[in-house]
Amino acid sequence: MVPNCAYGIDLGTSNIKIYSLSDDSVMMEKNMIAIENKKDIFAYGNSAYEMYEKAPANIQISHPLSNGVIADINNMERLIHLFISDMSKGNIRPADFYIAVPTDITEVEKRAFYDLIKDANVKARKIMVVEKAIADGLGMDIDVKNSQGVLVVDIGYDTTEVSILSLGGIVLSRLIKTGGLKFDEAVRQTVRREFNLLIGQKTAATIRQSIGDLEKEGKGAVVYGRDIVVGLPVEREIPTDLINSCLEEHFNTIIDSVKVILERTPPELGADIFKHGVYLTGGASQTSHFAELLQKS
């Protein structure tokens, strides 16, 4: 039985989500930290994200997680402590922690997630490492203990995990280094090539996330950036079909991985997936036209 004081943590490169059982609340913040003069915390979470691409040279803003694994253990520990402290209003009590990790990483990398909670000074009574695909399935109200095969595609910021679930376990899993970051970089490069315009990563993400609404309104994406030729800030309208075209290559990379997993799936589980479809999760899975392209494939 899960005790009353417990936390479930989903660490993503872009976002961190923490569920508190005691008050049935969920906190979602950007998984970013701003460090001043290489040592002092200047801002964290959404506040750090607001400063991204705008901060002076003495403030470094970074993601402590990269490609599904912990890249900066010290700052990740500081973030976990700060977020748990915020959720408990400064009164951190002994609690059990359940943390979701990718399946297709090494045992050493998985151990790092356990050590992260142990060393974050959050009074952990018990630490359980849960495979992320299983946690995703439970979060979507899928009966993961059923014998029915389930295909889950989790598209995150810099990785995508494709998994087959059945009988409470993971039958097959594949982690690839493609996600929202690659999508945004494709948008930036296309805008630069076609319009001689430099835009930031946050602007590229805003363009990508607004494509669906813009298409409904019959509009292009109006963006502000720096003209490479004259070196001055300018405004441009980017056609939505140009953005869709540049994203398709990365969509196909993910779809190819789905096909590889399906080719290795036992026939009976494959039949279940054919009947019940694919479950999409992760922030970048909402990118316009991905689901449509996957269905056609």
Residue ranges with predicted function:
Residues 1-157, 165-278, 285-297:
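Nucleotide/phosphate-binding catalytic cleft detector across ATP-hydrolyzing
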